[in-house]
C-alpha cells in the first residue's frame, strides 16, 4: 500500500507537464516498450513524442549478464545513460510510457534505486498527452552530455 501511495504522490498531470515542458531542469523520458516487438517503442518515439523527450531503451540499458530479461543495469551502464542524457541530481525527471500501464513503474523504481528523488510519472502516459492534442515532435534529439552524476544506489530497495 505504501508503494502505491508513493506512486500516486509522484504523478504529474499532462496540463502541469505542459507548463514546465521547456524548463532546463525538466528531463522527460519516453519509456514506451512492447513485449511483442522490442523495436516498436523506439519507432513510435522517432515518429512522435513529447517535446524534449529522451528515449529510454530498456533493452540497451538492462544487465546483459543476467539470465533474466530486463534486470537492473550495472552501475556504470546506468551512469553512462544519465551522463549522456544530461540528467543530474537536480533534474526533474518525468517518465511516460504508452498508456501509463506498467513499464513506467520499472523505470521509476530504477531511478529511485539510483538515488534520484524528483521522479514523476505522467498520469495517463503518452496516450492521454496525444488525446489532449498537446504538442508533439518527431525525430531524434541532440542531447548535451553531462558528467555531473555521481552514483548513489539504495540496495535496500532490492530483495534477492
Model-derived features with residue positions:
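Cytosolic catalytic domains that perform sulfur/thiol-centered chemistry
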Residues: 1-160
